Amino acid sequence: MSEVLNVEEIFGSKVFTLGKMRERLPKSIYKEVKKIIDHGGELSLATADVVAKAMKDWAIENGATHYTHWFQPLTGITAEKHDAFVTHPDESGKMIMEFSGKELIKGEPDASSFPSGGLRATFEARGYTAWDITSPAFLKEDATGVILCIPTAFCSYKGEALDKKTPLLRSMEAVSTQALRIVRLFGNTEATKVVASVGPEQEYFLVDRDKYLKREDLIFAGRTLFGAPAPKGQELEDHYFGTIRERIGSFMKDLNIELWKLGVTAKTQHNEVAPAQHELAPIYETANIAVDHNQLVMETMKKVAGRHGMTCLLHEKPFAGVNGSGKHNNWSLGTDNGVNLLDPGDTPNENIQFLLVLACILKAVDTHADLLSQSASDVGNDHRLGANEAPPAIISVFLGEQLEDVVKQLVETGDATHSIQGGKLLTGVSTLPDLDKDATDRNRTSPFAFTGNKFEFRMVGSADSIASPNTTLNAIVAEAFCEAADILEKADDFDIAVHDLIKKYLTEHQRIIFNGNGYSEEWVEEAAKRGLPNIKSMVEASETLTTEKSIKLFEKFGIFTEAELRSREEILYETYSKTINIEALTMVDMAKKQYIPAVMEYTKTLADTVLAVKSAGADATVQTTVLKSISEKLAEAQAAETSLEDKLAETAGIENPKKLAFFYKDVVHTAMDDLRTPVDELEMMVDKKVWPVPTYGDLIFEV
């Protein structure tokens, strides 16, 4: 029998929680820290010194030797620089371990080597990290030792945001301020803030590490750039929610333990649709903590997979022909006195506050559909969105039958008199209970779906930080709340004004509501008639960051300056170009050094066989036909490889980042597809024993 695991005991054991602060800090200091966490404010240096000492003592007791300001630059992953707690030895030669309040609050990493989109020159190296007091410090432990990690924001010497956390925190304050205006209108005077909560469902693939190391494309690009489909894929629908293999289950068990220690509320785990694909979902938490924890989830997945002889693939589309991976971003708003603004109750037609919030969100999503799409755009996501496995690239909102009916009543008559109820689900079996049925079904094809008391934004890519989608969501909803509050706060008769405004918003923005099949061609045509944007690539999406509408939105709430937005647009173009360039160079390398030589060797064997059969006086028609077919495909692959190299050479003459990104999308990417096609066809024709890399069957079924 395996050892009994005490989850309550290990949960948060590597986190400097409020509970540990309460135990270790003087009462007055703890109260000051708690007040700042709850309501904002600046920590005095004297208080920071006390907190730093308590934090250091706790970390050292748990084996830590170093600390780091843990931040999230515009690379999309985390960054850290480790500093030891050591100082100069005293007169007796004894080492003194210190950590000051100043070191806790502020760090100075080199800002010149991170993406800045022109905000910083190479010689302008100074950058600052600032402690995010609302996200608890934690310990990371691996073969390098134990490190105290302090979540921080990252900005330039001039104050520009150089990370993903700073805009997120700004957006959280913006939506809280504007949402408070809304709840005040309905008589809630107790709430002091409105909190954006997030729960990201993380999808991923696991492959055997030995096989992974034999694929250059997986190593350099994170996805397979070549690969014929295996005879069996996901068509039997037998992997989704299927029995978890013991090797995978062992990985999941260790992953859960590591995450629980880090305070991550890992709750749900299961097999996903594609072979070798799985999912982990946590419980919801405050948006910035959810962002931090999701970064820890992705990092921990990779580490734990390595211990089990596997590699975790987080790319949105590691294998062609089977489902890719996403990260469903469940988002909601709640007051600090326990009111979920997205809870419609049993009779949403009577819940005027909910209807106003819903109308504002529909207005926000419709007005800024392009910007919301951009927030989830990514090089890898281009391969996933719009296929019959993921939400379409067209933003629409699924409300379900109950809310759609309420909206219809309000638009047509200005009044909603009833709400469809769920009723009972009769199982028809005497030993099974009859079940309370929800008032609406779910729609897995919708990119932005209402799911009972939250919205699920399903376009986000599996490898992406969830900071940008939530920054954008918070910002666009803050704007809609602000405009509504501006009108209603001046109204002579609030009841009449709020009903009129709800009807106005729903009427003007009902085009964004779609409860049907988002995968269908009919929806693509219908969306075009409705005037909804259909942004199909990261390059096209990047342009939306710097439209007049977007700049006005972000500047109004102090989330981004125009300079910060333009820098991010440039970084996105550069990231796209660099990513496709790496993929293209990898394809060239694999084609020239692996595939073409292997096939040439095989054709030599076939040619020898043809000669041997003919010399024996036998019929060599079959051998000759096979040799001819393979030789023709080999020539096609060789020509495509040469063409791809030629296209890559042309990029050297394109200096404009935007034009270069479009060239990679329209020209280089097409040349990559042209090379993949004959190589994949050759894989189906050549003896498996001589094929130079593990196949799809090897990778996704042998793990």
Feature roles, as predicted:
Residues 125-314, 323-326, 333-570:
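Glycine-rich, acidic/polar active-site loops that bind/position phosphate-bearing ligands
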Residues 76-92, 109-112, 117, 215, ...:
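Short linear, low-complexity motifs centered on an aromatic residue
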Residues 64, 68-70, 291-307, 333-334, ...:
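Hydrophobic/aromatic-rich, well-ordered segments within soluble, folded domains that form packed cores
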Residues 47, 71, 100, 282, ...:
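Active-site proximal loops enriched in glycine and acidic residues that flank catalytic Cys/His/Asp
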Residues 1-7, 701-703:
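Basic/polar N-terminal segments that are highly enriched at the extreme N-terminus
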Residues 10-125:
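Active-site core of metal-dependent hydrolases
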Residues 218-219, 294, 316-317, 343-347, ...:
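Composition- and surface-driven signal marking solvent-exposed, interaction-prone regions
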Residues 502, 507-703:
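C-terminal amphipathic alpha-helical interaction region
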